[in-house]
């Protein structure tokens, strides 16, 4: 609203852990400690910090119950939702299921619940989950991310297919990028700003409190 710009949001797929099982059998703290070679105490401090930042934005992050299972099918459901104009609703519902409810979003029951909450046709949802539908969409997104955009972590944003922004950025930075994008309409190449916390295969940065 401040920038006076009407936005259309399109979500793309990017898996941080493609080999993850549908449900983790160890706690999220244990999993992250193993993945990033940290102590459990360090990981728990990191997650408390994230929870505090989330709370400031009105988001309840119950990190103690989070279960980071495989997200491939969740990405497929998001693509189904986007085909119905419900992409952002699907993402919000998945974030809520994972962050607040502590549900394993790699499991079918959770995905069916999310789909029902946002009004997707249960028959179409079953058709997707019982097949490979939208699998090519997920793989194509990830191929573009890795090979063309050189994405290594999330979050990652692309504006007007020309200006890229990586990491957890304050709203002021987004407004600056909107302005930059509007003022460089004839620019064809993608420029990237990466000076912000990201999560990738090797680390997960969280700003200091």
PLM segments and residue spans:
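C-terminal cap of thioredoxin/glutaredoxin-like
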Residues: 1-4, 78-209
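Structural alpha/beta surface segment adjacent to cysteine/selenocysteine redox centers
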Residues: 1-98, 204-205
């Amino acid at each position: 609203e401040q920038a006076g710009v009407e936005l259309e949001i399109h979500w793309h797929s990017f898996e941080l852990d493609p080999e993850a099982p549908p449900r983790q059998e160890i706690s999220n703290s244990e999993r992250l400690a193993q993945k990033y070679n940290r102590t459990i105490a360090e990981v728990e401090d990191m997650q408390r910090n994230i929870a505090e930042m989330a709370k400031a934005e009105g988001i309840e992050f119950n990190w103690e119950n989070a279960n980071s299972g495989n997200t491939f099918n969740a990405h497929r459901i998001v693509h189904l939702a986007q085909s119905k104009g419900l992409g952002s609703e699907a993402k919000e519902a998945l974030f809520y299921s994972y962050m607040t409810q502590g549900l394993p979003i790699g499991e079918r029951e959770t995905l069916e619940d999310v789909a029902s909450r946002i009004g997707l046709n249960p028959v179409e949802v079953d058709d997707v989950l019982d097949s490979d539908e939208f699998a090519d969409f997920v793989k194509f997104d990830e191929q573009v991310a890795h090979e063309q955009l050189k994405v290594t972590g999330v979050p990652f944003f692309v504006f007007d297919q020309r200006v890229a922004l990586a990491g957890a950025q304050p709203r002021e930075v987004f407004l600056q990028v909107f302005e930059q994008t509007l003022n460089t309409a004839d620019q064809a190449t993608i420029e990237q700003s990466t000076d912000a916390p990201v999560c990738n295969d090797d680390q997960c940065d969280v700003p200091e409190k």
